């Protein structure tokens, strides 16, 4: 009989400016945990346009910063960022670009991954941001998966959520459909991770 610890953890890695992407991460973690699998939520520090450091190594509050070891040892990955001119934030991109050692080792090959985002408007670049976050995951050899239309909330949502990934339109709290889509996405990554591990 396999225990929860046998399956490792799903890393939910995000950057959030105003808390919206963090809220998505928390809902995704509920979906992961519903499969008796650990959801490990991590964030990345804000980067600055000036040379001196503006962030300490340990955040003052909230989720702790992700390390390369967190990324290396995950059984599956969810990556989230607010939309910045139709692409991911510089802070998240900076962290992902520091993972070349894992690319050389093939540490993330054949692990499932998904993406999520938040924007200030419905046509604020959500889909292009989701696609931009998929690119480094594909280079790492990960198995990128979105949300199928068998998830009913995907056809009903009037705000965020797409087959490319979970999302939110800012201006109010997450809608019930957005929450359902996040949970379904987290659950799907966890189920795929368990299934792939059982094949090894």
Which ranges hold each PLM region?
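Alpha-helix boundary/capping detector
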Residues: 97-100, 104, 121, 139, ...
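N-terminal beta1-alpha1-beta2 submodule of the flavodoxin-like/Rossmannoid cofactor-binding fold
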Residues: 1-105, 168-200
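Short, charged/polar low-complexity linear motifs in solvent-exposed/disordered segments
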Residues: 105, 127, 133, 163-164, ...
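Gly/Ser/Thr-rich helix-start
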Residues: 20, 77, 81, 87, ...
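Short, glycine-/small-residue-rich phosphate/pyrophosphate-handling segment
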Residues: 109-158
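Short, flexible, mixed-charge acidic loops at enzyme active sites
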Residues: 54-56, 155-167
């Amino acid at each position: 009989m396999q225990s929860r610890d046998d399956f490792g953890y799903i890393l939910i890695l995000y950057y959030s400016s105003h808390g919206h992407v963090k809220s998505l991460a928390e809902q995704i973690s509920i979906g992961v945990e519903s499969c008796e699998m650990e959801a490990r939520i991590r964030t990345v520090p804000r980067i600055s346009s000036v040379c001196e450091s503006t962030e300490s190594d340990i955040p003052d509050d909230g989720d702790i910063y992700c390390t390369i070891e967190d990324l290396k040892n995950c059984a599956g990955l969810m990556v989230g960022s607010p939309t910045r001119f139709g692409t991911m934030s510089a802070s998240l991109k900076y962290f992902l670009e520091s993972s070349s050692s894992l690319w050389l080792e093939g540490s993330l090959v054949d692990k499932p991954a998904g993406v999520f985002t938040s924007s200030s408007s419905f046509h604020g670049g959500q889909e292009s941001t989701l696609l931009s976050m998929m690119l480094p995951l594909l280079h790492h050899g990960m198995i990128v998966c979105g949300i199928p239309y068998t998830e009913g909330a995907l056809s009903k949502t009037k705000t965020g959520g797409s087959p490319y990934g979970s999302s939110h339109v800012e201006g109010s709290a997450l809608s019930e459909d957005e929450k359902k889509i996040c949970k379904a996405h987290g659950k799907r990554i966890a189920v795929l991770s368990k299934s792939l591990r059982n094949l090894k």
